Design a protein with these regions (language model features):
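Polyanion-binding loop/helix "lid" in catalytic or ligand-binding cores
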Residues: 98-100
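Short HxH-centered metal-ligating active-site micro-motif
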Residues: 45-80, 93-96
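N-terminal glycine-rich anion-binding loop in soluble enzyme alpha/beta folds
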Residues: 1-39
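Alpha-helical scaffold segments in soluble metabolic enzymes
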Residues: 7, 11, 54, 89
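Conserved small/polar residues in nucleotide/adenosyl-binding loops
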Residues: 102-104
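Catalytic-core regions built around general acid/base machinery
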Residues: 82-90
Length: 104
């Protein structure tokens, strides 16, 4: 049986309800197809490019990170910016990103 991004998210949110997060916490699925298959999940503190590179190196299909990628309004995710590079790399390699600031 294949595990999906949606199933991983559901399991996380059943164990660590989103309602426990503060109002300002940026939690949830940032990118990734909920129907995509997940075989390996990488847990990290920060969703930075070095973590994405590690996910690629170990064959992770999903990253669960503690700190948010975007905490305030975003005006660009152009790949010339650090956060934009993260987003573009995740999407181009089909890696899902789930954020859970306080509640995990």
């Amino acid at each position: 049986m294949t595990t999906t991004v949606e199933q991983v998210v559901t399991a996380l949110e059943q164990r660590y309800p989103v309602e426990l997060a503060s109002d300002w916490d940026a939690v949830g699925l940032v990118c990734g197809d909920p129907a995509a298959s997940v075989q390996h999940v990488l847990f990290a503190v920060d969703p930075v490019l070095s973590v994405v590179d590690e996910a690629l190196a170990v064959g992770a299909d999903m990253i669960v990170a503690h700190h948010p990628l975007f905490l305030h309004g975003v005006h660009s995710v152009a790949p010339i910016t650090p956060k934009g590079r993260v987003v573009h790399t995740l999407i181009s390699h089909g890696i899902a990103l789930y954020l859970s600031l306080i509640h995990i």
